[in-house]
UniProtKB/Swiss-Prot annotation:
Protein name: Peptidase T
Pfam families hit by this protein: M20_dimer (PF07687), Peptidase_M20 (PF01546)
A Gene Ontology term for the protein's cellular component: cytosol
Record localization: Cytoplasm
EC assignment: 3.4.11.4
Length: 407
C-alpha cells in the first residue's frame, strides 16, 4: 500500500541532526534529541491520533492508541530510536531517486557514488524510489525510517477505524547507537505484552537473536628509562599491549567472522612506553562461548602478570547486553505473529541473528520480549546509506497487520 505522508515525514526527520555522543553523561546524550522529541515528535504523535502522549526524563516519547475491538486483548509496543550513528549528521540533504534505473547513483557533488559493483544490495531495487545522501553525511534511515513507519501506521489506523486492532503503545527513544538508550527504559510504564523494535534493514528481516556483548578496558603499566641503558630495566607498555593482543585467536576478528561466529574487536589504543590503554569489545551468541571469551582475556592478563612478576596488566570487563533469544524463545508469539503477517503480505521473512544489538536486547530482559523487524535501511552509519520507499511502505503494512492479527 502507498502512504502519501510517509516520504515527506521521513525527509523532515532526517534533516534534523540527532547524533548521539558517547562521551556525554546526560540522558539523552545530546540536547538535539530532546528538542527532536519535544518539538517534532510529540506534536506529531498527537496529530496522528495517539493519546496520553508524554515525554519521560529517560528520553522516551510515549503514546497510546487504544484498542477499537474488545476481542483483541493484546497490548503491543513499537519502538524506534531517535539518535543517529557517529558520522556527520549536520546538513543532511537527501536525494530522492524515483524509478531507479539500476545504475550508478552520484551522491550530489561530493565525488562519492553508489555503484552496484560495490553495493550489491542495489540490484534489488530497480524501479523503486530510493532516498540517498548527497555524500556529505549519513542519511539517518537508522532509525528515522522506523519512526516514520510507526507514525504512518498510527495515522492510517486512526483514519481507518474499520481496521480493528489491539492496544498499541509507541516509544521513541534516545542513544541506541551508543548502547545506553534502553538502560533507563521504564518497562512497567510501557506496560505491553510484547513489543517490536522497528530498527532492521532490508525487506523481511525478523530477528530475535542478538550478540551477547561485553566491553574490556585494559591498562598496561610500563617503566620508561633511557633506551641506551634500558637492558633489564625498561618495561615497554606498548610491547605489553602487543603481546596481549597476539595471544587472542588470530581469526576471531569482525572482518574474519560471520553468521554465529563471535569475535574480539580492538577498538582503540592510546599510550606510550610508560603506559597504554586499550579498549576491546567482546561478542558471541552462545552464553557459554561468551563467558569463555571473557575468561580467556582474564587468563591472558593473569598469565602475563605472573610472568612479569608484577601487576602490570589490569583488565576491567563490563557486560553490555545479552542475547534476547534467551527470553523470546520462552514464548515465540511475537515471532509467530510477525512471520504470519509478512507471509500474508507476500513478504518472505528473513529470520537470522543480528550481529549486533538493539534496544530490544535490553528491554527483553526487563520483561517485555522485543524482537526486531525491518525498517528498510541499507549501508547504515555512513555516506552510502539509503532506503527504499517501497520497503518502508511494506514496513507500515507489517505494523498494521501485526496489531490487527487475530490468530
Amino acid at each position: 500500500m502507498t502512504y502519501p505522508n510517509l516520504l515527506d515525514r521521513f525527509l523532515t526527520y532526517v534533516k534534523v541532526n540527532t547524533r548521539s555522543d558517547e562521551h556525554s553523561t546526560t540522558t539523552p546524550s545530546t540536547q538535539s534529541q530532546v528538542d527532536f522529541a519535544t518539538n517534532v515528535l510529540i506534536p506529531e504523535m498527537k496529530r496522528v491520533g495517539l493519546q496520553n502522549v508524554y515525554y519521560l526524563p529517560n528520553g522516551f516519547a510515549i503514546g497510546t492508541l487504544p484498542a477499537n475491538d474488545p476481542s483483541l486483548t493484546r497490548k503491543i509496543g513499537f519502538i524506534s530510536h531517535m539518535d543517529t550513528a557517529d558520522f556527520n549528521a549536520e546538513g543532511v540533504n537527501p536525494q530522492v531517486i524515483e524509478n531507479y534505473d539500476g545504475g550508478v547513483i552520484e551522491l550530489g557533488n561530493s565525488g562519492f557514488k553508489l555503484d552496484p559493483a560495490d553495493f550489491k544490495s542495489l540490484e534489488k531495487y530497480p524501479g523503486q524510489t530510493l532516498i540517498t545522501t548527497d555524500g556529505t553525511s549519513l542519511l539517518g534511515a537508522d532509525d528515522k525510517s522506523g519512526i516514520a513507519e510507526i507514525m504512518t501506521a498510527i495515522e492510517y489506523l486512526t483514519a481507518h477505524p474499520e481496521i480493528k486492532h489491539c492496544e498499541i503503545r509507541v516509544g521513541f527513544g534516545p542513544d541506541e547507537e551508543i548502547g545506553v538508550g534502553a538502560n533507563k527504559f521504564d518497562a512497567e510504564d510501557f506496560d505491553v505484552d510484547f513489543a517490536y523494535t522497528v530498527d532492521g534493514g532490508p525487506l523481511g528481516e525478523l530477528q530475535y537473536e542478538t550478540f551477547s556483548a561485553a566491553g574490556a578496558e585494559l591498562h598496561f603499566q610500563g617503566r620508561n628509562v633511557h633506551p641506551g641503558t634500558a637492558k633489564e630495566q625498561m618495561v615497554n607498555a606498548l610491547q605489553l599491549a602487543i603481546d596481549f593482543h597476539n595471544q587472542l585467536p588470530e581469526n576471531d576478528r569482525p572482518e574474519l567472522t560471520e553468521g554465529y561466529q563471535g569475535f574480539y574487536h580492538l577498538m582503540d589504543v592510546t599510550g606510550s612506553v610508560e603506559e597504554v590503554r586499550a579498549s576491546y569489545i567482546i561478542r558471541d551468541f552462545e552464553k557459554d562461548a561468551f563467558e569463555a571469551r571473557k575468561a580467556s582475556m582474564q587468563s591472558i592478563a593473569d598469565k602475563m602478570n605472573a610472568e612479569l612478576g608484577s601487576y602490570r596488566v589490569t583488565l576491567n570487563l563490563t557486560d553490555q547486553y545479552y542475547n534476547m533469544k534467551e527470553v523470546i524463545e520462552k514464548d515465540m508469539t511475537p515471532i509467530t505473529i510477525a512471520k504470519a503477517v509478512m507471509e500474508d503480505l507476500g513478504i518472505t521473512p528473513i529470520i537470522e541473528p543480528i550481529r549486533g544489538g538493539t534496544d530490544g536486547s535490553k528491554i527483553s530482559f526487563m520483561g517485555i520480549p522485543t524482537p526486531n523487524i525491518f525498517a528498510g535501511g541499507e549501508n547504515m552509519h555512513g555516506r552510502f546509506e539509503y532506503v527504499s520507499l517501497q520497503t518502508m511502505e511494506r514496513a507500515v503494512d507489517t505494523i498494521i497487520g501485526i496489531v490487527a492479527y487475530k490468530g
